[in-house]
C-alpha cells in the first residue's frame, strides 16, 4: 500500500498549485502500482507529528513532499523524529553532499538540511545535491517538483522494484445518459459483489465541457475479471433501459475496450 503527504501552507492557502499528486499517481501506475491514499497538511507541527505517528505505526510505504528544508517554517524532519521518538542527527552522507555542493560556503544553517531522524538513509538529489531521506518505508523529498520527481523515481526503482506489476489493474467504463446516479444503484449492486477484486464506480457529469449530462459508470481492478464485470454492468444498464456509449480511456490504467 502506498500513501502520500503533500505538505505546506502555500498549497492550502492557494499560493501554489499542487503538482505532486498527479505525478505520483502516474509514477506508480506505470510501474503497475497504485496510490491508496493522500493527505494535504499545513505547516503545523502537532498535526504533522500525529499524521506521521499514525502512518509509521501502519508500516505503509509513504511519500512525503515538502517541508524538509532548514527555514523556521519547515517542520517535517523534526516532526518525523518526534513521531518516531528518535533524535535528529547530522547524517554523514548528507553532510558530504552538502559540503560538496557548497564548499567553503558551507554554514551550520546549510548543514541543518542534512539533519535527519536517527536511522535514516539518504535519497540522492540529482538537481542540487541536497538529499532527502527515508525513514523506514517513509520517503521525504523537497516540495520543488523538479527535485522531487527524480528522487521519487529513484526510490521506486531502488526500493520497490520487486513489487512492480503487483497491482496491475485495468478499467472499463461507459457513459450512461438519461439517468441519475440513484437510478443506477441497482445495476452497480448487481455487479459489485459478484466480482471480488473489482470496484464499481460512478462519476456524474453536468455537461460542463459541452457534453450531454451523463454518469460515467465503470469497473476497475483485476484485469482478469474486468472485462467480464464490465459486460455484466453493461447488461444491467441495458436491461434498465438507459442509453449508453463507451467512455474514453483513462491515463494510467490498462483500459479494456467495451465489447
Annotate each language-model stretch with its function:
Residues 137-236:
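An accessory alpha-helical subdomain
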Residues 1-38, 43, 227:
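Glycine-rich phosphate/diphosphate-binding loop of Rossmann-like nucleotide-binding domains
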Residues 25-83:
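N-terminal small/polar loop signature for handling phosphorylated ligands or for N-terminal nucleophile
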Residues 248-257:
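Short, low-complexity, charge-dense intrinsically disordered segments
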